[in-house]
Amino acid sequence: MTNRRGKRVNWWQSKAYVGLLLVLMIMPLLWPPFPPLDDVPTHMGRFYIQTGMAGAPTLSSIFSIDWMPVGNLGVDALVYALHPLMGVEPATKLVIILIPLLSAAGLLLIAREAHGELPATAAFALPLIYNYAFHYGFINFSLGAALAFLLFGLVLRYQRLKMPTVWRTLILLGSLLIYFAHIFGWVVFGLLVVGNALYRHVTSWKISLAMVRAVVLECLLLALPLIPIVAWRSGDNQGETSAFFAIFDKWGWIESAMRDRWVKWEGLSALLCVGLIGLGIVGLMRMSRRLLLVFLVMAAFYIFIPYAFFGLIYADMRIAPLMLAIGILAIAPRPAWGRTAASAIALLALAFVTARSVATTISYARYADDHARWLKVLPSIPRGARVVALVAPPCPRGWNVPRIIHLPSMAIIRRDAFVNDQFDMPGAQLVAVGPSIPRDFAYHSSAQVRLPGCDRPEPLLADRIAQIPRGAFDHLWLLGVDPANRPKADWLRPVWSDERSALYAIVRQKTSSAAKAGPRG
């Protein structure tokens, strides 16, 4: 078999090899009942609110939905479309499985189009799909980035085929699609398109007006999302921008690009990715000039972007692994090395993907088992209850932190209960908590506490319990609180407990008849 250049197709360029890589990419997500990513329970709670409040009077009396052109709707929209067929939890799992699948397909397509064939090194980039942002549960962003990679690969393909109407339409309409998935996915797509435009039109160090004009016109195809952005980011929806030039954090985000559970394994994996890019930069490996320019554009953006960008936190952390992935796609073995050396490199790349996938599968299975133990309390929560959850994560917090801070949202999905775990992000979420729940206990920011002896900024558990508005809630759920630190107040009646968590019914004091009658005499 030969490729489009008439060259023999090597085994690492075959459909079977690509299919194997795609299977390895989805393997970690197949076993857990729901993806064990940090923020996913809160996202699923939001999806449930957006789709199922008609049969949940407690939720419908507390939550409201404000439909607006938010650049944060990718997984929301897909789950909304799929939930009538399978329910919110299976729909969420299916959509999240699609994210690494689309990402891998996009990255491999980019590499193939940039090099004219799939290089033996391309698979080294795939483990970066399971990056820190993905483990954190930034699923709308991850979907936006996956679409950005896939559409950019198609743009390169149709530019090669000299079909300008098709690739321009892909950029124009693809920008809008990616924006609605997540605004920062659109930013990623923009970086890819800008780098590619520089490659196509800047042909010498002597920059002419014609070059500038061609680059600008190509980049203007990205501008369609500015229309909903103006509507969305007007008024009070501006969002915070802060922490410019936190240079010392930049290397940390690169080092933790694949942060999940094992600090040495994930740190060394990230360093391997950096080392591979370094081999290309110093000239030991061949580099695609096109993808090198895209990588440099992303690197410049990464250096200058702040931590918080128009209300989007961890902005620079999200870019780091994607930048590394493009850098790896830019490299390829030199033709002079021969097929044997290239085959050995492809085997090493496959081994790396397999090892990363197996490790992530084990990690996710452990998180899923841990979640099942934490959620044994759910049957004891009355359907339609109003629950205030207080979570005390381990102190100090290291590389591997139990993913429990958003587990209370599972009571929204499985018990139709209100829990104070939705995000308070004006202008970035459709769901808001109504006035029947005091704002100090309405959102996720109210849920985290610390135990005595823990030197962290969260409030002490005892202080937070004393502040609970008893009239607004009927249950208290403590997670990560050992028996020695649990409250013994008269107004808290134990309902369920184990060594790590406890559920209490909040006993409301009844007003005595004498008090109702008022003072005499």
Regions found by a protein language model. Name each.
Residues 94-114:
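Transmembrane-helix motifs of polytopic, lipid-linked glycan transferases
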Residues 32-43, 54-56, 63, 71-72, ...:
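Transmembrane catalytic cores of multi-pass membrane glycosyltransferases
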